[in-house]
Curated annotation (Swiss-Prot):
Gene Ontology, cellular component aspect: chromatin; nucleus; PcG protein complex; transcription regulator complex
Native source species: Rattus norvegicus
Record's keyword annotation contains Repressor: yes
Superkingdom, taxonomy of origin: Eukaryota
Region: Disordered, residue numbers: 201-220
Protein name: Transcription factor YY2
Lineage: Eukaryota, Metazoa, Chordata, Craniata, Vertebrata
Pfam families: zf-C2H2 (PF00096)
Region (Mediates transcriptional repression) residue spans: 241-376
Function, as annotated: Functions as a multifunctional transcription factor that may exhibit positive and negative control on a large number of genes. May antagonize YY1 and function in development and differentiation.
Length: 376
């Protein structure tokens, strides 16, 4: 043992391995007793995710560090009890529900643009995380995504590229992008349509060609004595359906080899260009009125319809002494018949020659024939 007058030599052992017998330990006169509890750990509560830096309050922190006191150990082949504090790095799994609550309060709740393949004719659409996160909250074991936002984003993007909605099962869905036009602006909206519900184009064409044209009976042609095949004119319900049929436009003399494949149409066209120009009227009706929800194929038709809600009446009768105004042009044309006396709609029943300026008045009149017949 060295004397008290000898100088004390300090050896630095940091980052070096020195045999225990090389280091000479100095005994201590007094040892302070410290009560220790084994396996006691104090941790700092933070929010974050496993395997990444901790995020709390908008700042990033290093991985969680716990200070853990251990019982005395014999490091130098001696029996001296000493208090020793070591720094131990460990991982703590924070429940993903807390992470969800944090994300819902941040900009992750806003909408995210999903990339879409242009070859699939899909426009960029939007999806929000809030709906998925609310469904997963509190269902860690049952959640199909396991609280992993990256995995959920991958599923959504893959579904958008393939035209399949990941939240609608195994069915094949086709995405359609529509535009809701309101009085204050336009609002994009994405819709999904089940491909299994699409009709066979051949069957649609055959059904369209078999539909007869009854519009001629509304403009002067009389019902035949034997009646109309397939329609009981004495049945008020069938007669009402007859009056609701839309008239067909007259066809020209040139050949029309190309048929429209939409169900219930069956129109023929001279070439593919004319058919494609016509095909857009079958939808989808992407221009939707924000006031009443009525949809239109063309934006011009929607703007004309919105005049009903705004109260604007740009169409005015030009007859002297009248000056009435209308929101729609065809209402003005119908009104003008009052001044001209034109009544193009004639009752089709035999021995009845009543004429009307509006088709709605004729349809109401036709139903009176059945009512009078049932009263007799």
């Amino acid at each position: 043992m060295a004397s008290d007058t000898e100088k004390l030599m300090c050896l630095t052992t940091e980052n070096a391995e020195i045999p225990a017998d090389f280091v000479e330990l100095q005994p201590l006169d007094e040892i302070e007793t410290v009560s220790l509890e084994t396996n006691v750990s104090q941790t700092i509560e933070v929010y974050g995710d496993v395997g990444v830096d901790w995020a709390h309050g908008g700042h990033y922190h290093s991985p969680l560090i716990a200070l853990q006191p251990l019982a005395g150990s014999n490091l130098s082949n001696g029996d001296h009890d000493q208090e020793m504090i070591i720094v131990q790095t460990r991982e703590e799994v924070v429940d993903y529900q807390d992470s969800d609550n944090l994300l819902l309060g941040t900009e992750f709740e806003s909408q995210m643009v999903l990339p879409v393949n242009e070859d699939d004719y899909l426009q960029p659409t939007t999806a929000t995380f809030s709906g998925f996160m609310a469904a997963e909250n509190g269902q860690d074991e049952l959640s199909p995504y396991g609280g992993n936002l990256c995995g959920l984003t991958t599923i959504i993007e893959a579904g958008a590229e393939e035209g399949v909605n990941p939240d609608l099962g195994d069915k094949q869905w086709e995405q359609k992008q529509i535009q809701i036009d309101g009085l204050d602006g336009e609002f994009p909206f994405a819709m999904w349509e089940d491909n299994n519900l699409k009709e066979d184009p051949v069957a649609e064409e055959e059904a369209g060609e078999s539909t007869p044209d009854y519009s001629e009976y509304m403009t002067g042609k009389k019902f035949p004595p034997e009646g109309i095949p397939g329609i009981d004119l004495s049945d008020p319900k069938q007669l009402a359906e007859f009056t609701s049929m839309k008239p067909k436009k007259p066809k020209g003399d040139f050949p029309r080899p190309v048929a429209c494949s939409h169900k219930g149409c069956g129109k023929m066209f001279k070439d593919n260009s004319a058919m494609r120009k016509h095909l857009h009227i079958h939808g989808p009706r992407v221009h939707v009125c924000a006031e009443c929800g009525k949809a239109f194929v063309e934006s011009s038709k929607l703007k004309r319809h919105q005049l009903v809600h705004t109260g604007e009446k740009p169409y005015q009768c030009t007859f002297e002494g009248c000056g009435r105004r209308f929101s729609l042009d065809f209402n003005l044309r119908t009104h003008v018949r009052i001044h001209t006396g034109d009544k193009p709609f004639v009752c089709p029943f035999d021995a009845c020659n009543k004429k009307f300026a509006q088709s709605t008045n004729l349809k109401s009149h036709i139903l009176t024939h059945v009512k009078n017949k049932n009263d007799q």
